[in-house]
């Protein structure tokens, strides 16, 4: 099942179900579920509830997707996005070549940081350039995991049931800000730096866990990143297990699992994003 947040014709934002082919939506309010945000709804959208919703929408007219404006599935996350740094070996190599000081890659443990998101950018939306602060604007295509229930002290190998679903996230990064401050929070948290979506696909739509998925990004049609999530150094099971030790991960938590090689700073010479491109 696919979940979105959409702006209805009357201007109200409502979490909704997106059809498999992406052409229709059913606002949850039409189905008797009055949740202000998808984050609020997620803890209650259990497999049993979703099964009932699937039966219900088969007999209810939908809105054509053209009649609504899709937002990011979780426009304003309740907490910062949890991110993994340097989680693909090829990206580790390119990052260290760009700046060994800022991206030292000799580590045996996962690198975690957080990303402030005041308002996530919808699919096809605009990234703010912040030209007064940023001259080296970069992109990072990532698989993001959305938790469906609170996770605390979850054993390794038992994290699957905590995953609500997956979405796509662009961890936009100001490389000059990032390297100047010797840490990543500020350079990744500027307004408009988190395109995400268009939808969350529930975990039960994938045959394997963790899923092995192609992950690609393009800039103006040019393929830049082309990898597979099976190449992650620390997989989703490891990450949820480790982060939940002594720390409660709330339902609705978003975990961005790292980007593969092919980012702008890794090219020779580096090729960063510019306003209008």
What are these regions (language model features)?
Residues 100-121, 139, 274-277:
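Structural signature of FAD isoalloxazine-binding scaffolds in flavoprotein oxidoreductases
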Residues 72-74, 80, 105, 135-137, ...:
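Residue "hotspots" at secondary-structure boundaries inside conserved domains
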Residues 8-10, 18-24, 147-149, 203, ...:
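Short acidic-glycine loop/turn motifs at beta-strand connectors
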Residues 4, 71-73, 100-103, 128-137, ...:
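A generic local secondary-structure boundary/capping motif
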Residues 13, 49-54, 61-63, 68-69, ...:
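Catalytic-pocket segment enriched in acidic/His residues
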Residues 121-164, 169-175:
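Non-heme Fe(II) oxygenase catalytic core, chiefly the N-lobe of the double-stranded beta-helix
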Residues 1-106, 110:
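N-terminal non-catalytic cap/leader segment that marks the start of a structured domain
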């Amino acid at each position: 099942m696919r979940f979105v947040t959409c702006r209805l014709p009357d201007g109200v934002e409502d979490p909704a179900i997106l059809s498999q082919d992406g052409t229709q939506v059913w606002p949850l309010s039409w189905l008797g579920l009055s949740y202000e945000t998808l984050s609020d709804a997620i803890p209650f959208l259990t497999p049993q509830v979703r099964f009932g919703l699937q039966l219900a929408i088969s007999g209810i007219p939908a809105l054509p997707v053209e009649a609504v404006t899709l937002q990011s599935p979780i426009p304003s996350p309740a907490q910062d996005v949890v991110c993994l740094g340097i989680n693909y070996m090829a990206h580790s190599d390119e990052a260290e070549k760009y700046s060994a000081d800022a991206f030292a890659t000799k580590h045996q443990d996962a690198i975690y940081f957080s990303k402030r998101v005041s308002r996530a950018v919808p699919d096809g939306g605009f990234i703010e350039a912040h030209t007064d602060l940023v001259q080296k604007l970069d992109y990072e295509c990532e698989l993001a995991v959305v938790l469906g229930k609170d996770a605390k002290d979850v054993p390794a190998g038992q994290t699957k049931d905590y995953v609500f679903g997956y979405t796509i996230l662009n961890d936009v990064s100001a490389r000059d800000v990032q390297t100047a401050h010797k840490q990543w929070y500020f350079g990744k948290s500027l307004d408009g730096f988190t395109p995400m979506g268009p939808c969350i696909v529930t975990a039960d739509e994938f045959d394997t866990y963790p899923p092995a998925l192609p992950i690609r990004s393009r800039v103006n049609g040019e393929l830049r990143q082309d990898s597979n999530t099976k190449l992650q150094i620390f997989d989703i099971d490891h990450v949820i297990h480790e982060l939940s030790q002594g720390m409660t991960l709330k339902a609705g938590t978003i975990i961005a699992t790292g980007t593969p090689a092919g980012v702008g700073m890794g090219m020779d010479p580096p090729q960063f994003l510019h306003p209008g491109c």
